[in-house]
Curated annotation (Swiss-Prot):
<comment type="similarity">
    <text>Belongs to the UPF0246 family.</text>
</comment>
<dbReference type="Pfam" id="PF03883">
    <property type="entry name" value="H2O2_YaaD"/>
</dbReference>
<dbReference type="GO" id="GO:0033194">
    <property type="term" value="P:response to hydroperoxide"/>
</dbReference>
<protein>
    <recommendedName>
        <fullName>UPF0246 protein RrIowa_0836</fullName>
    </recommendedName>
</protein>
<dbReference type="GO" id="GO:0005829">
    <property type="term" value="C:cytosol"/>
</dbReference>
<dbReference type="InterPro" id="IPR005583">
    <property type="entry name" value="YaaA"/>
</dbReference>
């Protein structure tokens, strides 16, 4: 089984990461192509296309301009935000972290896909951002889908567990994915309707990654006992391709 999660806008390059063997992102050539486009933008253009403040545009302009000399950090330790904070990465054993290295991918607008220990530099680029004529979802779709197919071909249980947001999981082409896609949903009953509450769903996704790592889980079936923040598996609302957890 291979799980996917979204990258995060929030980064943490201040806190030191544990010493571990680092790896290199697989699509650096394509990353450099995107960087060339990003480096051509003015601060004002970055502010507009990314819908960010002038201050953030300045920070990212400086990052892109001197990208090669920026500090590097393992992706799983560099990203912050609700998903990553609830993985509690700093508490994972080396064994659990090594398991994630072969069973988790982080979807990124700049890097395409990242293994947890792939080194990244500080950046901001959401998958929905349009760069000139480049649609990032289309830009990455074939490369990412083919890469996932290659990884799953070597897995014992050939499932792709989708814990990413729709914005990022859209980079997977279902028509070219050779193996079973299993989507995970975290729902809450609000006024008689089942709804996804973003912040709670993000926390639950991170907690599920933590459970996968700590228990070496390689099958969606083994996740049905997952419970966090009051979520519980709903047989009624689930199917072979959809795992639905409802908050009581």
């Amino acid at each position: 089984m291979l799980a996917i999660i979204s990258s995060a806008k929030t980064l943490n390059f201040e806190k030191l990461a544990p010493k571990t063997e680092l790896t290199i992102p697989v699509f650096l050539t394509l990353t450099n192509k995107l960087l060339a486009t990003l480096q051509s933008y003015s601060e004002n253009q970055l502010s507009k296309i990314m819908n960010i403040s002038a201050k953030l545009a300045h920070i990212n302009k400086e990052r892109f301009k001197d990208f090669d000399n920026q500090e590097s950090k393992a992706a799983i330790f560099a990203y912050a935000g609700d998903v990553f904070n609830n993985i509690h990465i700093e508490k994972l054993t080396n064994h659990a972290l090594n398991f994630l290295q072969s069973h988790l991918l982080i979807i990124s607008g700049l890097y395409g896909v990242l293994k947890p220990l792939d080194t990244i530099k500080p950046y901001r680029l959401e998958m929905a951002t349009k760069l000139n004529e480049i649609n990032l979802t289309n830009f990455w779709q074939d490369e990412v889908t083919n890469y996932i197919n290659k990884i799953l071909a070597k897995q014992e249980n050939k499932y792709l567990l989708n814990l990413a947001s729709q914005e990022y999981s859209s980079v997977i082409n279902p028509n070219k994915l050779k193996y079973q896609l299993v989507n995970v949903h975290f729902k809450e009953n609000r006024n008689g309707k089942l709804s996804t509450i973003g912040i709670n769903a993000k926390k639950a996704r991170g907690a599920m990654v933590k459970v996968i790592a700590n228990n070496l889980i390689d099958s969606p079936e083994l996740l049905k006992n997952f419970s966090y923040l009051g979520y519980a598996f709903s047989t009624k609302h689930s199917s072979d391709n959809e795992l639905v957890f409802i908050k009581s």
